[in-house]
Amino acid sequence: MDKQEKRIRRARRTRAKIKELGAVRLCVHRSLNHIYAQLISPRDSKVLVCASTLEKEVRSQIKHGGNIQAATAIGKLIAQRAKKAGVTKVAFDRSGYKYHGRVRALAEAVREGGIEF
């Protein structure tokens, strides 16, 4: 089993537990150059809010999308959009990634934005 298969297996386990809770899920995906965040509804699995470093407004603020500063910017943006959508509490789905670096920076920025985990 390689590194990616292990990550996907961890992600499946986490998603199953979050599904039992029935909470809105904050799903994070990271690549080498970008980071993506989505709020997904528990019932019909539809995306309520999304933000990524590919968006024009974010690209103008940051130089490179694959670092901690970019993750912090995305965390703040997703928190603002979540509040507009009426979401105040979420379950954090880190997609099998370690809670470290960019994933941690995004999560902390979302918490600072007023969203509860």
Curated annotation (Swiss-Prot):
Keywords for the protein's UniProt record, in alphabetical order:
Ribonucleoprotein, Ribosomal protein, RNA-binding, rRNA-binding
A Pfam family the protein falls into: Ribosomal_L18p
Q: Matching InterPro entries, A to Z? A: Ribosomal_uL18_bac-type (IPR004389), Ribosomal_uL18_bac/euk (IPR005484)
Q: Which Gene3D superfamilies match?
A: 3.30.420.100
Chain segments annotated as coiled-coil in the UniProt record: none
List this protein's GO terms for biological process.
translation
Alphabetical GO CC annotations of the entry are: cytosolic large ribosomal subunit
An example Gene Ontology molecular-function term: structural constituent of ribosome
| PANTHER family named among the record's database cross-references | 39S RIBOSOMAL PROTEIN L18, MITOCHONDRIAL, LARGE RIBOSOMAL SUBUNIT PROTEIN UL18M
Q: How does it assemble?
A: Part of the 50S ribosomal subunit; part of the 5S rRNA/L5/L18/L25 subcomplex. Contacts the 5S and 23S rRNAs.
Biological role: This is one of the proteins that bind and probably mediate the attachment of the 5S RNA into the large ribosomal subunit, where it forms part of the central protuberance.
Q: Which family does it belong to?
A: Belongs to the universal ribosomal protein uL18 family.
Protein's name in the database: Large ribosomal subunit protein uL18
- Species of origin reads Coxiella burnetii (strain RSA 493 / Nine Mile phase I)
